């Protein structure tokens, strides 16, 4: 086993602290950070979907991208590059989002939910690991979305520039955006505090290469578990924080913004894990890479935003359990998750060396 990378551990611990702190400051329970949920909220705020309870310009997303961008510029790691199957990456990003919203959370929120005692997230983790395992099998056999290329500075600057523009608009003309009056979208920390925390997290994630998918993938492929230590650090810090705040609740029922539709929790996160391996990283990692100038990751993020809009406009997202209803994933969402798995399989086969694709078939 390789030595512990303490930068990854420290970054994971700080992400965990940030998640607990943001919840204390107003973010929904077990949702101090969630890339899928926050991109979904931004899509709603920008009127891309009409779900009134999940609409808010989340400064955490802006901060993650800009924190990564600033750190990459300081360290000389900012590079404008792209051109690696952008349309395919857009589609993968959309289906990763659909899978995440069936489960009600990205891989980062899955870990945060585990730290809060939500055992539904354990089911999600099983599906997530299975999805990564499947993706790794294709990767080992030569799956590739082909190389990227050095591009004009403007290409790599698109997502950071969009985030700066979004921040300026939400400060100067907040009436342009929808903002939830109830539900998860109405629960948020102070914008400037959340932005500051996310800038720090984005910078640390850039330096440490923190990735929820990468730790499991690298462990399976190379026996290298150093990124997994960040995953564990987030869990332990969130667990300790919840115990200290008396907000830890072990079980399946009564969990915040969650449901116990186990088959679809598992399959939703299987789709997320598999799709993320093909993209080269989890949704958090895609944001960080986009901040570094990676246009392909920016396309994946835009695909996620489009996927969030589709999920809520067409009833694909899971419904959280309440005292009155069990919640879960409806028929439309189930069809979308199965379709997503089929699409990801087709993409996996289509981007393997021809002899390997023939064997897999």
Label for each model-derived stretch:
Residues 1-361:
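Membrane-interfacial helix-loop segments of redox and metal-homeostasis proteins
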